[in-house]
Amino acid sequence: PILGHMLQGLDVEQNPLLTFGQDKPMPVVYEDDDLVVVNKPAGLLSVPGVEIEDSALTRIKNLYPNATGAILLHRLDMSTSGLLMFTLNPKANKRMQRQFIKRQVQKTYIADVEGVVANNHGIIDLPLAPDYYDLPRQMVCDKTGKASETHWSVITRSKSTTRLALKPITGRTHQLRVHCAHPEGLGMPMVGDELYGVIGERLHLHAHKLEFTHPTSKELITIEAPVDF
């Protein structure tokens, strides 16, 4: 009661973390009775954080309040933009989860790296593990790391950067970022990667394409979202 009396007449500002990211639109690029795919902007969480409530999952639950199961099937880092898939009912979720587990969903990312890549394509196979002394960073570790494989190909080259198409075969945390930056990978960090390279306006990593079999119709679906950097 005393504190309430003291605060009377004072304007208490709302915690800015509660509305963090709400100025970033998240367009729906595909929807039906089973699935929703959105183009997540860079700077928006995939799921709610400890302090930040706004997220792709929160927005989907608000957009589809009658869905029997708005479930996120995979995640993107907060600084990564691009395609995220949600299921809207338990049956679709079970069938799509099976595809993700069996690695039947094909994902293609587009990234810009610092430097000019000499070869036109290749495969990076470096095991990854959390760097517990410097989280959330991940590190290459032959002893405790989990198998991680990335296929890459060059799209374009400029004087100082290279645009790549990246296809992760596995889905480890920061896999694409570490595989590009590590000396045993490409040895070239992504543009704007504050964890493994040099900080910039934004991370140049975008989830560009999803290819999968529809859980109900069994039709092969391909969805793309244009790069915005």
Q: What function would you assign to each model-found segment?
A:
Residues 1-229:
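RNA pseudouridine synthases
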